[in-house]
A protein has these predicted regions:
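ATP-binding N-lobe of GHMP and related small-molecule kinases
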Residues: 1-118, 135-143, 328-352
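Predominant activation on well-ordered alpha-helical scaffold segments within soluble catalytic domains
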Residues: 27-31, 59, 88, 128-135, ...
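Short alpha-helix boundary/capping segments
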Residues: 79-82, 119-122, 220, 224
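Short beta-strand scaffold segments in enzyme catalytic cores
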Residues: 28-32, 50-51, 58-63, 161-173, ...
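Gly/Ser-rich oxyanion-binding loop with an adjacent helix/lid
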Residues: 5, 100-190
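C-terminal nucleotide
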Residues: 2-39, 43, 187-352
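Short amphipathic alpha-helical segments
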Residues: 82-90, 126, 146, 271, ...
Length: 352
C-alpha cells in the first residue's frame, strides 16, 4: 500500500537566535505500544497504530543558542527542571545524530479540554510539538522530509509522539533489529470521516514509564507481541477496514489491561469500570459502539454511527468530551500564544 517512504537526512543549517514554532495533538492508539526493545534508541518491540484527536493541543517555540550553557524548558509559563533534564537526554541524542552543537530553549503551552486525566496522551502532543519546532529550527520549515524527521525525533521525548506528527491514521514502524533512522511513523491515507468519537477523562496516579518496564517481565508479553504482528498483517490485508480498526482498538485495550494485570498493575478505576459496564449493556441492544483506552482509565468511545453515539451520550451523567479525528496536524500559532511567546523570549534576553 506504499505506507513506508524514505527520505535522506538534509544538511543542518543552525542559526543563532532563531525561533521556530511547532504544534501537536494527542494520538489515541488502535494498535497499542508498551515495552522497549532498545530504550536508548527508543525502539519498541512492535509496530503500533493510532488516530490523531483534538482533546488537547500543545504549542511550542524553540530557540537555538549557539553559545548557551544548557537546555531549558518552560512548560505552561513556568520553568520545569524535571522536563529540562529529560529534554537534555532527547536533545543530546538529536545533537549526536545531526552533528549540531549549542543549546535549545523551549516555551511550551498545553491547552486541554478537561481538567485532569490519565491516558489522554498529552505527552505525545508535546513530543510532536517540540520535535516539529526543533526540526524547523535546524533544517528549515520547508525541508522535504520535515514530518518524517519530526516523527523520528519525537520518539526520544515520547514513543507515541512519533505518531502524533501525522494527521488521521498513522503507524509507527518498530521491531527488534530495525535501524534507528527507520524507526518512525508513516501516515496511512484513508477516509476517517465516518468514525465518531467521544472521550471520558478519568484520573489515576501512576507512571507510564513504570508500565513499560514492568510489561516486558510478564509471561504474557511474548504471546502478546506475536498476536500483535499477526493482527497487524490482517488489518493491512483488509485495507484498514474502519470496522476492523474499532474492533481491534477495543481488543487491544483488553489485551493490554490483561498483560499489565499479570504483573500486578490495574489500569482501570471503579469509575472507568462502571462506564465500561454501561457501554457493554447499551450495545447489547445497540450494536456498533466500541471503547478503548491506553495506559490509563480514560475511555474513548467510538462508532461508525453518529446517531448511536448521540443516543449513548444522552444516557450518560459522567463528564465527556465530544471529539474529532484531526485532519491537519500543523495548526498555526494563535495570536495569544504568539504574544506570550514573544514576551517570554524578550524577558529571557533582558535577564542574560
Amino acid at each position: 500500500m506504499g505506507i513506508i517512504h524514505e527520505e535522506n537526512m538534509p544538511v543542518p543549517e543552525p542559526e543563532d537566535g532563531r525561533i521556530t514554532f511547532g504544534s501537536g495533538y494527542p494520538s489515541k492508539a488502535i494498535e497499542k505500544f508498551i515495552g522497549y526493545y532498545d530504550r536508548n534508541s527508543r525502539i519498541a518491540y512492535t509496530p503500533s497504530m493510532s488516530i490523531l484527536t483534538d482533546f488537547s493541543i500543545a504549542r511550542a517555540y524553540c530557540m537555538y543558542n549557539r553559545s548557551g550553557k544548557s537546555d531549558i524548558v518552560y512548560l505552561d509559563s513556568r520553568f520545569d527542571p524535571e522536563r529540562s533534564e529529560s529534554a537534555k537526554i532527547a536533545l543530546d541524542k538529536f545533537r549526536s545524530i545531526c552533528g549540531v552543537k549549542g543549546y535549545f530553549t523551549f516555551y511550551i503551552e498545553r491547552e486541554r479540554r478537561y481538567v485532569r486525566a490519565k491516558g489522554l496522551s498529552e505527552s505525545s502532543a508535546v513530543a510532536a510539538a517540540v520535535s516539529s519546532a526543533l526540526v524547523s529550527n535546524i533544517f528549515g520549515y520547508n525541508v522535504k522530509a520535515h514530518s518524517m524527521l519530526a516523527s523520528r525525533f519525537a520518539k526520544f521525548v515520547s514513543g507515541s509522539g512519533t505518531r502524533s506528527v501525522f494527521p488521521g491514521l498513522s503507524t509507527w514502524i518498530s521491531y527488534p533489529g530495525i535501524q534507528e533512522p527507520k524507526c518512525l511513523a508513516h501516515e496511512i491515507k484513508i477516509g476517517l470521516s465516518k468514525v465518531k468519537i467521544a472521550m471520558f477523562p478519568k484520573f489515576a496516579d501512576y507512571s507510564t514509564n513504570q508500565m513499560h518496564e514492568l510489561s516486558v517481565k510478564s509471561a504474557q508479553y511474548i504471546p502478546w507481541v506475536l498476536n500483535k504482528f499477526a493482527r497487524f498483517e490482517e488489518i493491512i490485508d483488509r485495507s484498514f477496514s474502519l470496522e476492523d480498526l474499532l474492533i481491534r482498538a477495543e481488543e487491544e485495550m483488553l489485551n493490554l489491561n490483561s498483560l499489565l494485570m499479570s504483573v500486578g498493575r490495574v489500569l482501570q478505576t471503579e469509575e472507568s469500570l462502571s462506564l465500561i459496564e454501561r457501554i457493554i449493556s447499551f450495545r447489547k441492544k445497540n450494536p456498533g459502539l466500541y471503547f478503548t483506552a491506553d495506559t490509563g482509565p480514560s475511555i474513548l468511545v467510538m462508532t461508525l454511527n453518529e446517531n448511536l453515539l448521540k443516543e449513548f451520550l444522552e444516557t450518560e451523567t459522567d463528564f465527556y468530551i465530544s471529539g474529532n479525528i484531526v485532519k491537519d496536524s500543523s495548526p498555526s500559532a494563535s495570536n495569544a500564544f504568539r504574544e506570550r511567546g514573544k514576551a517570554f523570549f524578550e524577558s529571557l534576553q533582558r535577564s542574560q
